[in-house]
Amino acid sequence: MRWHALAIASALVVATQAHAADKKYGPGASDTEIKLGQTSPFSGPASAYSVIAKTQAAYFKMINEQGGVNGRKINLITLDDAYSPPKTVEQTRKLVEQEEVAVILNPLGTPTGLAVRKYLNDKKVPQLFVGAGATLWGDHERFPWSIGFQPSYQAETAVYAKYVLKNKPDAKIALFYQNDDAGKDYGNGFKKGLGPENTAKMVVAESTYESTDPTIDSQIVKLKASGANVLFMHAIPKQAAQAIRKIGEIGWKPDMFFLAATSTSVSSVLQPAGFDHSKGIISSYSFKDPNDPQWKDDKDVQAWHDFMKKYFPDGNRQDQLIVYGYVVAEATVQVFKQCGDDLTHENIMKQAANLDVTLPLMLPGIKLKTSPTDYFPIEAMRLQKFNGEIWELFGETIGND
């Protein structure tokens, strides 16, 4: 009997050791926790975007209360970088070298993200779902540890350009965007969508602004004076609201007014600008808008409202940035589910580059899909127009494979 008991005990020890050996952990991961790092502008000119980080913290709290991911709780550490690249460098180094996080999740901004891209790739730390759509975030060959999330800015503006060519072939176009890599990507994308011949013929004015500019009034007045009857604008929420209001106040009524999808928040952009000035603006979207009556009986939208009520009661439900933050958090949970018990940096990045899933708040027909050679998780969208109260979708899904 004694030898029999010893044999069973030995077998159990071997089985336990084998099971433990199946688990692989890199920095920031253990049997009980997955530690994520993030930089977000809680202060500075882009502070409206900080609601994304707040949403994700609330979402992970919900997931943790439900038992976590594969039994592990998600610990999100978010540091303020004020939308300042030097500050992003400082805070990211702190997250990697002191906190030893598993990933840098959804850091906000192209100029800020670029400031740490080489550092994170040299360290082989996943820069996961960067909160920007500059085309350079798809550079999987040179920067395999950095992956974007939303449709690329060039893909987005190509949709607007094609809409103009189809519906107003004699347009006089003005382009207004932020003077950084993101803004230039938007401007170049619009021109690329028009084609060289149409760009030379149709683009009559182009102007930029700095994220630190206290006002953009002079640029708007200059663009109106060009005689343009179609306007495309990329701006962070503060300047977007200023510009829309100024356009309305000086009586400029472009026949078409396209607004970059990064600044479509009703609460932080359109409401401050004035709904009367915002009516008729066109943009694009890939998610369900919980304020759109067509989704009032949708179970996934109802689940979002339940989440908001319990975990983020102070959040403004008219802020589309909250929906974005929620979807990114869902995608992050999907990555960690796929990781199983292998939570090394290598496997986290491998799973992020092998996604094929439809998340609950995505519009019908739009998927989250990546591959080792495709670092743009979302590549489809629909056009939407602001009716003075909410955004209304129109047209077909564009960019779906």
For the regions a protein language model found, what residue spans apply to each?
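Extracellular/periplasmic Venus flytrap/periplasmic-binding protein
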Residues: 86-90, 135-138, 143-250, 294-295, ...
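Short, low-complexity disordered leader/linker segments with a strong preference
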Residues: 1-35, 398-401
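Extracellular/periplasmic periplasmic-binding protein-like sensory domains
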Residues: 247-324, 397-399
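Segments of small-molecule ligand-sensing domains
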Residues: 310, 314-323, 333-391
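Immediate post-signal peptide segment of exported/extracytoplasmic ligand-binding proteins
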Residues: 20-37, 65-73, 165-172, 342
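Periplasmic-binding protein-like
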Residues: 95-108, 128-130, 173-177, 227-237, ...
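Beta-alpha junction/loop-to-helix N-cap segments that form part of ligand/metal-binding clefts
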Residues: 21-24, 33, 48-54, 66-139, ...
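Extracytoplasmic "Venus flytrap"
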Residues: 24-33, 37-57, 79-86, 108-109, ...
